Amino acid sequence: MEGNKMLTYIKEVLENLPTDWLNLTTHRLDIYDEKAAKTQFLEQFEILCKTHNSDPSALQSLPTAYDYIRLGHPLSCVLEWTLANLNQLNPENVISFSSQTAAILAILRTHLLNGKNTQIVYTGALPDAFDTETLKQVYGYHFELKQVENTAAVTKFDGSTIYISQQKELWTVEQSSNIDFYVQTNPALGSVLLVNGHQNKGYISDIQHVRRRETIAMTPVNCLKTLSVLTNTSSPTAHTILEANKTQV
């Protein structure tokens, strides 16, 4: 689907957002098929998109696990699907995290087990939680670290290259054949990982496993914030819920 039409549809989805997409994180057993938990929601969502159906009842009826601790949730699925389309990637190649560093650690662990060289390049500053010495001395991860100005400065590497950038707009990616993984971080929102190239497809299940077992997807509120900025849509609902949660805590 052409980018502008897709974003117009996403904007309409946000305007008709089911309240459960923000509030409900337990199983909807009446519409949940565990065997298709990772694919069923997006398959049905794409049908609605193609027919430009953003009716609240249609969105509410989409089958999903509604469990961001394990498999992702409706808004993380929509965010990942949107970013994948904007960057001409398969939706499974885009994975969101509440953490800024979990995706990086998942890749480093896989490389340690496989004995693969790793180059981490970054623009600006690394995430505060990224402790180079701890990763090397305690976890035994091996990697080269290099600061660059942009993706054009990333050179070919005998191994795998992770590109980290901190920015407000998590969807902005300048693709390069010299980069295997893009990690877009935002201290207030989390991070988004983009897996580049068919040769890296095998990493996806391992990274999803880490998110499922050790962390969570970007939260519903933060996904809504990101999608709202992307589509120039206000999201008072997200702000209201966030402030209410802070009060309860």
What spans do the regions from the language model cover?
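Conserved N-terminal alpha-helix of the aminotransferase class I/II PLP-enzyme fold
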Residues: 2-105, 109-249
